[in-house]
């Protein structure tokens, strides 16, 4: 099936091309009214505060029940949808710092969720088996089980890798380049780009269009994070590097300290040179399980009873929840 993209869309900033159903995601999948309706249900379920327009989730859902989704679908299809500025708030962190959180309007959240639904369906089978964050039927406990498995196989030297302000520093051009490898419909890429560049509203002042990052708080951010970090996952899988990743939290498992040092250099070079991300060298650590470590809110501890230390060089890795 061929889908024609009109010159009107081209004038709105989209490429005038012919899109085929075998070319990956097409815009009509995003704007399908059933998908938009399901996206609205997800936003309702997640609740959340109003964006800069003050419209609540309940108010928006009631309005859509009355008006339906035809008009919204047509606006997006015509290339005329424009995201509103994202409302910025700050959430306290355990260490006393504050984490910036972006609150899009409810309608923008619905459209983002519609995009995320389609991206997730398309990309999930492409993701590494060692990736656990924001994926169907996977969670923290699955990530911990995989970490325990790798450690019990003798890979007890661990790289606890920290990406510096990951969500705020994702390079838009690189992300769009990665997306374009699989998505040939320029209309989809342009719509995602508009959301990435949406201005930020803070204390009543609206900034210029955003140049970096996928603000935490938008439904698209988790899947976009997985898509760009899957580039590094693929490199590690091909190299036989054992790792566990949950969104931007990553642990890499090695058999010796020297191997861990070499692997850290290789992974850091890829993340910084290929994906234009920044590894936080102060927080990134190489450690041994014998001293215990934290991952995703769990304590991973190697317990060796004194009377078997000499006869049992390996032991079970235990996990306790905090």
Which role fits each region the language model picked out?
Residues 1-63, 69:
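Non-catalytic, polymerase-adjacent accessory regions of viral genome-replication enzymes
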Residues 68-71, 75-90, 94, 126-292:
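Conserved polymerase palm-domain catalytic core
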Residues 100-101, 105, 309-312:
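Conserved phosphate-binding loops in nucleotide/dinucleotide-binding enzymes
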Residues 107, 111, 116, 176:
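Duplex nucleic acid-engaging cores and interfaces of nucleic-acid transaction enzymes
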Residues 197, 274-322:
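A conserved non-catalytic segment of reverse transcriptases
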